[in-house]
């Protein structure tokens, strides 16, 4: 509200103002930065997250040949009703698929989360609804199967 009033006082349209935000905000856990950014955009201001790239773990994922990628527990709490967050999760799952790594979502605690994951075709998850344990020797990696079929 302070920024909005300041812009009005100085005859500056909010859509002409862009706030530069460090990617560190993506690591926040209390939701305050996300809420502030949402409020700013609702007032007409623009927000630009800078520095995405070099230190971003998702961009470095291609350097590692992993059979599985365990996603942060935050992925489990994404609601099917939150379209933007769901789009981000779909993108990460598609990236894992392109890299031939099976994504694992951890801390699944309710049926709605499980339903959302099944709709996204995510087969691996942990938590109280995760099912039964299977010994590692019975789990074949997708990469090993691909190497056999390439021969």
Stretches found by the model and what they are:
Residues 1-5, 33-34, 89-90:
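Well-ordered, non-membrane alpha-helical segments in soluble/globular domains
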Residues 33-36, 57:
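Short beta-alpha junctions and helix-cap segments that line functional grooves
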Residues 8-11, 41, 62, 97:
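Residue-level signal for alpha-helix termini/capping positions
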Residues 16-29, 45-151:
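EAL-family c-di-GMP phosphodiesterase catalytic domain
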Residues 1-13, 38-39:
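Bacterial c-di-GMP phosphodiesterase EAL domain
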């Amino acid at each position: 509200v302070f920024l909005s009033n300041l812009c009005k006082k100085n005859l500056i349209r909010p859509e002409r103002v862009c706030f530069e935000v460090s990617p560190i905000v993506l690591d926040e856990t209390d939701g305050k930065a996300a809420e502030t950014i949402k409020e700013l955009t609702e007032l007409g201001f623009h927000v630009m997250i800078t520095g995405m790239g070099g230190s971003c773990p998702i961009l470095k994922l291609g350097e590692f040949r992993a059979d599985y990628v365990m996603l942060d527990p935050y992925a489990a709490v994404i609601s099917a009703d939150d379209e933007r967050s769901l789009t981000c999760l779909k993108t990460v799952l598609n990236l894992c698929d392109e890299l031939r790594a099976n994504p694992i979502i951890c801390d699944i605690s309710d049926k709605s989360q499980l339903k959302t994951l099944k709709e996204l075709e995510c087969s691996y998850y942990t938590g109280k609804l995760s099912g039964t344990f299977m010994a590692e020797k019975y789990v074949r990696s997708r990469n090993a199967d691909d190497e056999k079929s390439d021969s």
